[in-house]
Amino acid sequence: MCESQARTNESVLSEDILYLSVRELGERIRGGKLSPVELAESFLTRSEALGPKLNAYATITRELALQQAHAAQKEIAAGHYRGPLHGLPYAAKDLVAVAGYPTTWGARPLAKQSFEYNATVIEKLNRAGAVLIGKAAMIELAGGLGYSAGDASLTGPCKNPWNTNYWTCGSSSGSGAIVAAALAPWAIGSDTRGSILCPTSWCGISGMRPSFGRVSRRGAMAIAWTMDKLGPMARTADDCGLVLSVLAGHDPLDFNSLPPGVSDFAYSPATAESAKPLRIGRLTNVWNQQVAGLESAVDAALKVLEKHGATITDVEMPDGPYEEAAELTILMESASAFDELIVSGRCAELIDPVGQINGYASQEFSVGDYLQVQRVRTFLQAQVDKLFERFDVLATAGESSAAAPLNAPPEEDSAGPIERRAPDGVSSLCGLPAISVPCGLSKEKLPFGVQFVGRALDDHAVIAAARLFQSHSDWHKMRPPIS
């Protein structure tokens, strides 16, 4: 039976089609087995039905999506195929500017904000023939001024498709829910300190934070200029590689963009394979505590890799104030990024009480304070770099737990000792690439993730590790119980 017959009574493509990977959907579009228009219509219909139940979208861009889908369909029929994302729907986190549409940054005082231009990543995707079906919901200001609970969003708390009494994590909350529930095959997320990796882990999908400077951030809201990254959240690690190959590249309008050539990311199944057996360091000291079943799930994932040629060696993250340095860098840089909002007093309109006041405290830091933190940061980066003399990638859990209940505060704001070596803080601070992919389920039937971290600029290595695991496991094929 061809895909055009695989429909529900409402003429929407079946879940078996909508849960296909980016690569599989792209191949079917290229081969004429799937129409970009019917694919867009199906994802739009599903998004309009399930998106509100999850608080997953800030805006659904139906008119734009259908316009782009029809254009893609005509081009492909005429033999003008632009590449693996041509005619393929996606969602973009609502901190990425899309001309003519609201870009609210998830924040109540900016609910009517819009821009007259597209972010560089949107321009790249337009040139690739991709189809934007919506702006994904997010935590207000991506948590840049702090927050204490998952309801700190203009659109309300984003609910986890695996259990709507649980949260998706933040700040790329909508992007995680959208991909997990097959409202789109992939989405743009942003990550300053775990905002791609946490929703990826909690939602049971694959998500990648590229090396710092690999993807242009022009037209995306800034939190911390020296730590912000944009990256793909998708069904598989292979999907992340495909999407990253389109998003990556030098942008002269982003002063932190890597130089031409260095910033490019060529990707194919051949480049995704490691030429030598992967040397993987299993981090043994990065979480204060892990929930029951998580450590064994990660160990089982690493045994799969070991069975297929990788070497696994236990290693400790060198001691140091990684989390403090990451947090202080974000606090100081966000005080500058959101200066207008703070000085005007409009931060009082934010939903979360932490965000309402945090900016004022952050502006009390001095230039000397900032420089001292950056000196410490340079030392910590050198310590972490030494680990990659022995390993290609480092591995640990995607997060220290499965998804938290909607009414629970983020773990870092709960009572207990600070996670001084949490990998999201360490690798974000050092500008390292990382990917999280699903590796199991908790006793509550919520996803666990395993995370791979690579040396700066070696984005291929983390994809290779995740791809090797996914080629010998089925956790990425799980579907949440939502329809």
Label each PLM-derived region with a short phrase:
Residues 32, 87, 127, 131-133, ...:
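Glycine-rich, small-residue loops and helix-cap segments
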Residues 206-299, 472-483:
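A short helix-breaking turn/cap at a secondary-structure junction
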Residues 1-68, 77, 284, 307-309, ...:
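An N-terminal boundary/leader segment
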Residues 33-41, 70, 124, 266-269, ...:
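Acyltransferase
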Residues 85-105, 267-284, 329-385, 436-447:
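Short helix-loop capping/hinge segments that flank enzyme active sites or metal/cofactor-binding pockets
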Residues 117-250, 428-451:
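Short glycine/serine-rich loop segments
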